[in-house]
Curated annotation (Swiss-Prot):
Similarity remark: Belongs to the transferase hexapeptide repeat family. LpxD subfamily.
MF annotations from Gene Ontology: N-acyltransferase activity
Lineage: Bacteria, Pseudomonadati, Bacteroidota, Bacteroidia, Bacteroidales
Protein name, as recorded: UDP-3-O-acylglucosamine N-acyltransferase
Catalysed reaction equations from the record: a UDP-3-O-[(3R)-3-hydroxyacyl]-alpha-D-glucosamine + a (3R)-hydroxyacyl-[ACP] = a UDP-2-N,3-O-bis[(3R)-3-hydroxyacyl]-alpha-D-glucosamine + holo-[ACP] + H(+)
Flavoprotein keyword on record: no
Keyword Repeat assigned: yes
Species annotation: Bacteroides fragilis (strain YCH46)
Length: 346
């Protein structure tokens, strides 16, 4: 399917610099651009590529001014990266979609299936489960009894939504993710650890995306809640009774212990660990591998274990590199002081 620069500019409200009749049929990174491809430039580090790219159309920010000739047709927009996302969504929507239930899928008689749903081979839909309109269930995905999946969702292969859990509209669950497994709850006894039944559920609100092999545990009682717009990377662990605020994003291998509340619009780097029963405010940014043992107020930008402000962390890092030399210097100073004491005592 081809689109012209004129059509694209109209869709994303951009200004064309060059040939409005230039057409594209695919996407490419600016450094790998080919004729017939559309690319984008948002990071100044990649500016040199715009003068040599073979892409037919390039999205650029409005403040971009070429320093030499650019062969590609440019479309100037407020935010090139955001406009690219809109075009990619349009491209995905233009692809033909399958509907219907494959004969090799298992769908319980009591399940409710919406309109234009596709259920692939070997998918399993349990008793009294509900699947919303236009949702796609890929092979070997499982929706447990009584679970509810909203409209326009995608459940990729081997993703699992346990019984009675709730998934909102426009959610994406990537391969191998598990929604609603038991929380890690055990009571210590003289005979060992006795399992505490986890009778709660997980609620995913609208527009949530869950990465591959990410686990969100069901609550002991009540609900583990992931609010609207949350994006979780691969291999993230959300424990029982956690609550994650709207539009918070977490990179791979973040782990959050039970009953912690995370605010809205937070950003956590990879391998961040947060202890249980804490409150993390809104718009908190945590650098990679931060370890959080206590509450954090809104607007904080922290890194390290325990987390500290960025300036303090980088100052401490510089000092840390010098510790071996400082240790030698300290030993020498102690030795000199002891020698001076001995001389004074004579």
């Amino acid at each position: 399917m081809e689109f012209s620069a004129k059509q694209i500019a109209a869709f994303i409200q951009g200004e064309i610099i060059g040939d409005e009749n230039a057409t594209v049929h695919t996407f490419a990174k600016i450094e790998e651009g080919i004729p017939g491809a559309i690319s984008f430039l948002s990071n100044p580090k990649y500016t040199p590529y715009i003068y040599e790219t073979k892409a037919s159309i390039v999205l650029v920010n409005k403040d971009f001014t070429p320093e030499q000739e650019v062969k590609a047709t440019l479309i100037k927009v407020d935010n090139a990266y955001e406009s690219l996302a809109k075009l990619l969504n349009l491209y995905e929507m233009s692809k033909p979609k399958r509907t219907g239930i494959d004969e090799r899928a298992y769908v319980a008689e009591t399940a409710k299936i919406g309109k234009d749903v596709y259920i692939a081979p070997f998918a399993c839909i349990g008793d009294h489960a509900e699947i919303g309109d236009n949702t796609v269930i890929h092979p070997h995905a499982t929706v447990g009894g009584g679970a509810k999946i909203g409209s326009n969702c995608i459940l990729y292969a081997n993703s699992t939504v346990y019984h009675d859990c709730r998934v909102g509209n426009n959610c994406i669950l990537h391969a191998g993710c598990v929604i609603g497994a038991d929380g890690f709850g055990f009571a210590p006894t003289p005979q060992g650890y006795e399992k505490i039944p986890q009778i709660g559920i997980v609620i995913l609100e609208d527009n949530v995306e869950v990465g591959a092999n990410t686990c969100i545990d069901r609550a002991t009682m009540g609900a583990t809640v992931i609010h609207s717009g949350v994006k979780l990377d691969n291999l993230v662990q959300i424990a029982h009774n956690d609550e994650i605020g709207s539009h918070t994003v977490m990179a791979a291998q973040v782990g959050i212990a039970g009953s912690t509340k995370v605010g809205e619009w937070c950003m956590f780097g990879g391998q961040v660990g947060i202890a249980g029963h804490l409150k993390i405010g809104n718009q908190v940014n945590l650098g990679a591998q931060s370890g959080v043992p206590g509450n954090i107020k809104s607007g904080s930008q922290l890194i390290g274990t325990p987390p500290m402000e960025l300036k303090q962390f980088f100052k401490a890092s510089i000092v840390q590199k010098s510790l071996p030399e400082m240790q030698i210097e300290l030993r020498n100073l102690r030795k000199e002081i002891e020698e001076l004491k001995q001389q004074l005592n004579k």
